[in-house]
């Protein structure tokens, strides 16, 4: 691959050392997809054009990364104001850098038309009404993460994990506040 120009801000020497340490690394990208009913709260997410399309955002992102087009909907996911999914940039980056990737389904309401690791988890409930997952399901999810994390990280120098979960940022904030 040709050298890419990288701009750094802050501690330039530290940034150079870090980027140089990654130069010969083998990267793999993992997209974790899921769904939470929290995303259905009006105004909480911009991960889909409207409430009906939210459930298609994650599987469509996974399909777009794999195929270059979506199978579960007619176009890439868009925000209510017409902005395209961040998966557009992710795909371009993965393609340019020739980084292999895979998908983990951690509770998507709609299953993508791609091969994926399946956690067998249900999607999350609305956290403003109840717990998203039962304590047993949380333990199951953490254990699945540990097992698959150990397995997939071993053959890689650098595993990059991304997510496509409408309402996921709000849910993550609630979890962190709960800690």
Language model segments and positions:
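Generic N-terminal targeting/processing segments that precede catalytic cores or assembly contacts
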Residues: 1-114
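A glycine- and small-aliphatic-rich helix-loop capping segment at beta-alpha/alpha-beta transitions
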Residues: 49-50, 118-123, 174-179
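Gly-rich Lys/Arg/Thr-decorated short loops/hinges at beta-loop-alpha junctions or inter-strand turns
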Residues: 69-73, 119-133
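Short gly/ser-rich anion-binding loops that grip negatively charged ligand groups
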Residues: 75-83, 128-131, 135-138
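Short, conserved acidic/polar surface loops in the N-terminal third of protein domains
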Residues: 112-117, 172
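Glycine-rich, mobile lid/loop segments that gate access to catalytic sites or pores
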Residues: 132-178
